[in-house]
């Protein structure tokens, strides 16, 4: 008479925690395996990182050509002259929040061409 999987599961369910630990140790020794390796492999696929879809464009420093940076900020944000100047002078400052990757890269490129130091977060 052979033992079924259900009977084994019932027997393990009836065991105390210490008995289960001893059973696992005995199985590791008998079959030459490690229960920890199986757990690590099972946990691997759960760590899927989501790709970021919204980015913040941060003006880190204005560089040598302040006027060109102010013009680039005005054209990119639609701010008035005073608001754009205040934003540039308050660097490091967040210029735009929650923009797409393409928009963030485009904005970064135009500001860097004007001489600013820009970071996309």
Curated annotation (Swiss-Prot):
Q: Does the keyword section mention Ribonucleoprotein?
A: yes
Q: Which GO terms describe its cellular component?
A: cytosolic large ribosomal subunit
What biological process terms from GO does the record include?
A: translation
The GO terms this record gives for MF are: mRNA binding; structural constituent of ribosome
Query: Which InterPro entries does the entry link to?
Result: Ribosomal_bL12, Ribosomal_bL12_C, Ribosomal_bL12_C/ClpS-like, Ribosomal_bL12_oligo, Ribosomal_bL12_oligo_N_sf
DNA damage listed as a keyword? no
Q: Which UniProt keywords apply?
A: Ribonucleoprotein, Ribosomal protein
The source's superkingdom equals Bacteria
- Indicate the quaternary assembly: Homodimer. Part of the ribosomal stalk of the 50S ribosomal subunit. Forms a multimeric L10(L12)X complex, where L10 forms an elongated spine to which 2 to 4 L12 dimers bind in a sequential fashion. Binds GTP-bound translation factors.
- Role of this protein: Forms part of the ribosomal stalk which helps the ribosome interact with GTP-bound translation factors. Is thus essential for accurate translation.
UniProt family annotation: Belongs to the bacterial ribosomal protein bL12 family.
What's the name of the protein?
A: Large ribosomal subunit protein bL12
State the organism named in the record: Pectobacterium atrosepticum (strain SCRI 1043 / ATCC BAA-672)
